[in-house]
């Protein structure tokens, strides 16, 4: 008889010691990577800036503040301008993810992804462009390059003074400077600070899956900023737990949003990555979400493979690509990783009270 395989510490708890879903005994399908995080994809780094100040009644411009910024570098902070092939999917378009016209046209984006609150999305985009310019050499600056950065948002106004515009340029830069590989924090951190999910405290969550194909092992990692769902909809590992945890009062129709980012080191072309982004939406469904009328459910998938081909500006390029018959196993890995990332965003959380005493239970 063989003994049970010990669960790695990073699968059980976040770096700050917050419980993750696996640590609480929730069973999931699939084999995660070393950290069960999007950072299992080599080169990917994630950083946060979390802003929590004040309590009591809302005073616009003063607080309470419950917000922040998340930064995600596809090829690490050491290569801030690096491009990646990508695909985009909007399951429900009541939200914003900038730079997607370029992704739809050319199948790529450049530089870091930022995720924040709805009214700080434009600021994050502009600061990213300025920061990228400042990190160029003098010769490159003379060419006056341009960027169309990826910045995404969900609404945190239930807990946060969203119209106070408390995220500043220095906060976006702080998230860049915090970017790292390895295990990353989850829950009420970064852009996820003031978010709610299934009427619990939501926010930042991540997970990964390993995929064996053609004698190689690839990784698919997911990162979400969860801010969607009604309590009764919640499913965990297929069990309808939300119906057993009713609210005292009906909160009305489903609002909120989710931003999902899927990274892989598998060599995929943009059209394949768009198909991956579509499958990420199934991860919401696995948790019980339905993409309500006022929900913005937006997904971006990118590959870290083929850096030379992605960044080539002329000539004939050669790229290594997966055969189409491989895609189904990556679809499955994506769905399971997104599902677990959402549930992790719930588990790795604590009760938060924000503006006007509104409380999101952890």
What is each PLM-predicted segment?
Residues 2-362:
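Alpha/propeptide regions of enzymes that mature by internal proteolysis
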